[in-house]
Amino acid sequence: GFTPRGLVEMTLNLQALVNDLGADKVELHLIGHSAGSLINGHLIRLLWARHLPIATSTLMAPACTLDFANRTYRSVIEGGGLQRDDFHMHIMSDKREQDDNVIGVYHKSLLYLVSRSYEELQRMPLLGMAKSLDGAYQDFSDPKLSEWNIAAQDMTTQWNAFFWDNDVPAGFAATGSGLTHPRASTLHIYNDPKMTYGPHTKADTSHGGFDNDLNVMTTTLKNILGLDADARLDQPFIDLDY
């Protein structure tokens, strides 16, 4: 199988660091945006194979397939290398996905383009698409009407049974509303039409904007620090318009 040599070297260096400082002095926090979910998926599995637990994992608009997520994130979480409550995702609502564009040529989000054109299966469910996680879009009884390719049924069913603990909610994908507070505390669905990059800078919500948004990055840092959602950071993000 695929062996990401650079990530192997990174893992070995992290293992050496933990051995030098002591496991109680090192916390591993992973953050991945878009295709970064692929890098982190390989990395998280390599880390746990060497018994290095991950304190938190945060994905923003992850572009990996549900099959990949099953083989990496799910495998590590079920194996004890990462707690489910410390696995966070920031994604767009389906309304925002459909309002997004790719360089003004493709008039939906990058994830829609990848799902429908660039994967092994056309209409491949991707981890960062709200519809992939919504029970209302998991009816595979009629291949012509199904949201996803019929060949993706098993990966979709398996991931959602795991992710939702066998109780898959339905009807939230469009705007993100309808999830209970515990569920929305790890699946952060962005439905605001604008993202805030700085004190005087807003931009249309987009696939590429998550790591520029003050709210997303603040929430991510609070999760890493173990702070409550309403806590204030001593040194808050002020301007991420870069």
Residue spans for each PLM region:
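Short, hydrophobic alpha-helix immediately C-terminal to the catalytic nucleophile
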Residues: 41-45
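Gly/Ala-rich beta-loop-alpha elbow adjacent to hydrolase catalytic centers
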Residues: 31-36, 40
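Lipolytic serine-hydrolase domain surface
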Residues: 1-27, 46-240
